[in-house]
Swiss-Prot record:
InterPro entries: p53-like_TF_DNA-bd_sf, T-box_DNA-bd, T-box_sf, TF_T-box, TF_T-box_CS. This is T-box transcription factor TBX1. SMART domains: TBOX. The keyword Heme does not apply. Its main location: nucleus. It comes from Danio rerio. The gene is tbx1. The lineage of its organism: Eukaryota, Metazoa, Chordata, Craniata, Vertebrata.
Length: 460
């Protein structure tokens, strides 16, 4: 079991406690007859057996699985309870209860983001598994209390099947149905928190996050990820292991750890989300899924930058610098000229949020026709994203004659990026201000009265 996860400190830890003994003891009851069942949640159709430990408070499970009549999954730990289920290591009636080491007996654990877990649990939590491995969301995070500040502890997690069933999702009824018996069991693995081992004071002073844990369906995975079967239900377990300095610590392996089970973290492993409500909730609550949000711009927070899809859509409707100039009538030319007029101070008179948005997200410099020098992006006042108007915007001309930028310097205001040197030296172009009649092919585009006269593309 342990060999699947290569940790440099694991070998050094061998003289403190027998980690292999703990792992073997913790996982040995996976297929052991008589192992006690996970406690039922109200309305959970799985559970028709008495639980042998006190369940942690959790919202009602809304998994609409049908055809299942049991939920067998072992869990081990101390007989006391905390904010989650803390189960007995002696599950069978003919075994004596193991007295826990005082270093772990008083440890309590509180699940972080419990309200979010409850919200997912009511819908039926799904977790994506991929060949390369996928992180969990919500992330498993806990706050720990009651450790000995000067003692060393290891924190680890494993995942146990809830039952011996395989499931499928019925879209017509928006419910999970039993599809048959479970696939062969995957290799049992545990995930060690990368900061293990550490002093109790270190663990208790901050929230412990298992954000590095990844789930995979690759049976040949050699990266130490947790291997799960898709379309099966799993229960995460959290273990606290006291690093016993005694040389014969393997004799006390069952005394030196405590296990916690949060039933609201139970989930179904999937390769793609089945319940569209789960998809929506993940997008709405995951800060890394902002690009997938499809909501009214009026609902955007003022400091929220819209996703790349909206940005590229706006960019596609504005202009293409390399395209040929379109033919315009007089009204369109006047609108375009007024759109890009500037006041004497150099500030753009227009307040077009699309171009202001482009000035924040495009590359540091845009090449000018002919490769003369780099044209900067404006650093004018930012407009809040909720004012973005993608429809009804007058189409600017696809030509650099109406370029909205004035000063030929590189852009220094986007995320503090350093300037990039222009591909050609600036002195060679000094004094060559742009004039629309320099190119005979474009001389007839403007009349004497409508030609823009305040465009100066020369360096300052």
């Amino acid at each position: 079991m342990i060999s699947a996860i290569s940790s440099p400190w694991l070998t050094q830890l061998s003289h403190f406690c027998d980690v292999a003994a703990f792992t073997t003891s913790s996982l040995s009851s996976l297929n052991t007859p008589g192992s006690y069942h996970l406690s039922p949640s109200p309305g959970d159709p799985y559970s028709h057996h008495e639980s042998q430990f006190e369940p942690c408070p959790a919202a009602q499970h809304a998994y609409n699985y049908s055809g299942s009549n049991s939920a067998q999954a072992p869990a081990q730990g101390d007989s006391g309870t905390s904010n989650c289920s803390s189960s007995s290591s002696s599950s069978t009636p003919n075994k004596t209860l193991v007295k826990k080491n005082p270093k772990v007996a008083n440890i309590n654990v509180q699940l972080e983001m419990k309200a979010l877990w409850d919200e997912f649990n009511q819908l039926g939590t799904e977790m994506i598994v991929t060949k390369a491995g996928r992180r969990m969301f919500p992330t498993f995070q806990v706050k720990i209390f009651g450790m000995d500040p000067m003692a060393d502890y290891m924190l680890l997690m494993d995942f146990l099947p809830v039952d011996d069933k395989r499931y499928r999702y019925a879209f017509h009824s928006s419910s999970w149905l039993v599809a048959g018996k479970a696939d062969p069991a995957t290799p049992g693995r545990v995930h060690y928190h990368p900061d293990s081992p550490a002093k109790g004071a270190q663990w208790m002073k901050q929230i412990v996050s298992f954000d590095k844990l990844k789930l995979t369906n690759n049976l040949l995975d050699d990266n130490g990820h947790i291997i799960l079967n898709s379309m099966h239900r799993y229960q995460p377990r959290f273990h606290v292991v006291y690093v016993d300095p005694r040389k014969d610590s393997e004799k006390y392996a069952e005394e030196n750890y405590k296990t916690f089970v949060f039933e609201e973290t139970r989930f179904t492993a999937v390769t793609a989300y089945q319940n569209h409500r789960i998809t929506q909730l993940k997008i709405a609550s995951n800060p890394f899924a902002k690009g997938f949000r499809d909501c009214d711009p009026e609902d955007w927070p003022r400091n929220h930058r819209p996703g790349s899809l909206q940005i590229m859509s706006a960019f596609a409707r504005t202009r293409n610098p390399m395209s040929s100039p379109p033919q315009q009538n007089g009204t369109e030319k006047e609108d375009s000229r007024r759109e890009y007029d500037r006041d004497p101070s150099g500030n753009p008179l227009h307040s077009d949020p699309t171009h202001q948005l482009m000035s924040r997200v495009l590359s540091p410099a845009l090449p000018v026709l002919g490769g003369l020098h780099a044209v900067p992006l404006t650093a004018g006042p930012r407009s809040p994203p909720h004012e973005l108007r993608l429809d009804g915007h007058p189409q600017p001309p696809d030509t650099l004659h109406h370029h909205p930028y004035k000063y030929p310097a590189t852009y220094e205001h986007y995320l503090g990026a350093k300037t990039r040197p222009s591909p050609y030296p600036s002195p060679s172009i000094r004094g060559h201000g742009y004039h629309p009649h320099m190119n005979p092919t474009t001389a007839n585009m403007y009349s004497a009265t409508s030609a823009p006269t305040n465009y100066d593309y020369g360096p300052r």
